């Protein structure tokens, strides 16, 4: 089972870790809800650093 890392992007383009989850649908849902709530872009990254998805607010 792989870990998914949810990261958010600040106004200067830097990416910062928010949290880790194991279940991909739940990680996507969390990223989507938080992107909508904060108005900031979020992305899902695996442990090897590969970007799996980018969520726009």
Features from the language model and the residues they span:
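Short aromatic-glycine-(Arg/Gly/Cys) micro-motifs in beta-strand/loop hairpins
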Residues: 1-17
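Solvent-exposed, well-ordered amphipathic alpha-helical segments
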Residues: 8-11, 28, 32, 36-37, ...
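Short N-terminal "domain-start" leader segments
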Residues: 1-5, 33, 43-45, 51-57
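Surface-exposed loop/edge segments in extracytoplasmic proteins
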Residues: 13-19, 50-54
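A short, charged, amphipathic alpha-helix used as a generic interaction element across diverse proteins
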Residues: 21-46
């Amino acid at each position: 089972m792989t870990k998914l890392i949810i990261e958010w992007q600040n106004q200067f383009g830097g990416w910062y870790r928010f949290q880790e989850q194991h279940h991909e649908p739940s990680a996507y849902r969390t990223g989507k809800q938080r992107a909508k709530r904060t108005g900031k872009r979020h992305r899902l990254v695996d442990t090897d650093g590969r970007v799996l998805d980018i969520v726009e607010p």
